Amino acid sequence: MTATSMSVQEVSDQSVARWRDYVALTKPRISFMVLLTVVAAGFLASTVVSVSALRVFNAVIGTLLVAASGSALNQCVERLLDARMSRTSNRPLPSGRLGLTEVVVFGTITLCVGLVYLWLAISPMVAGIGFATWVMYVWIYTPLKTRTWTNTIVGAVAGAMPVLIGWFATGATIHPWIIGLFSLLFLWQFPHFMAIAWLYREEYEAGGMQMLPVVDRRGFWTAIKAVLSAGLLIPATLLPVVALEGWTQIIYGLVVAALGVFYLYGACLFLRDRSDGVARKLLRISLLHLPLMMLVMVLSAWVCS
């Protein structure tokens, strides 16, 4: 009886561990950010056109499935590189907890289900955006990471594209809100990724990844890239002010400018002092900046709707 109970417990523990490994394949933090951006885009679109909440929900489900596939297959491609870096060596593939074949099957199934779901539940165009995002992330950005430091440009485009799924799923057309939101997601990533890449530059080098701090030993151009991107982010996110009116227009402009200057300040600190401590400060500022910016956009659009 005891042996049987222990066997059942062991099977249960193994099942839970296996489930956690599959969840880890989807990179939950990235998936959560994708969810937020799709919902934010859908809400902003609802202030421009009449939107069914079901369509936004369908966009979230389909996008999460495609994103899960991208994360899993990205780890398939990078499994040998991940094994060289301490921050990634415990992932399911390099640690040997999951096999390559089963992860490829998982990634293929989630991709197909996600694309079919977007096609049938929303439209072929939205499914096409989802597929283009997946291709850009898995088959362009991922291989480029070992070839050129410009990989982050492609990665930033792929990272911003889910907002297009959320927006166009509603039937909305080009509008200052989607231009501003896409610009936010695109430009925000550079200071954020430069801080991360600087902190883990030695591990990236050990893994054979050509991030800018790996080739830019002093970090000058890494910091310049962060400063320029943070600077461009201010006018780009001020664009939606033309869709607002009255006091909302003024308040939006002031708050967005203040948040942008705060982000730029963090990047300038990094330019002046390229230490790990300042890089962490920039990273923390970036993690505060993005959700606050999306919240300001959503609230401003809601007030004027």
List each model region and its residues.
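Cytosolic, membrane-interface loops and tails of multi-pass inner-membrane proteins
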Residues: 2-17, 77-98, 191-221
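The first (N-terminal) embedded transmembrane alpha-helix
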Residues: 27-44, 157-160
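Membrane-embedded alpha-helical segments that form the functional core of polytopic membrane enzymes
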Residues: 36-44, 48-79, 87, 111, ...
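Helix-coil boundary and interhelical linker segments in multi-pass alpha-helical membrane proteins
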Residues: 43-61, 113-128, 163-186, 236-251, ...
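Multi-pass membrane catalytic core of lipid/isoprenoid biosynthesis enzymes
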Residues: 79, 87-127, 217-242
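Intramembrane alpha-helical segments
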Residues: 100-170
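Interfacial loop-to-transmembrane junctions
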Residues: 221-222, 264-292
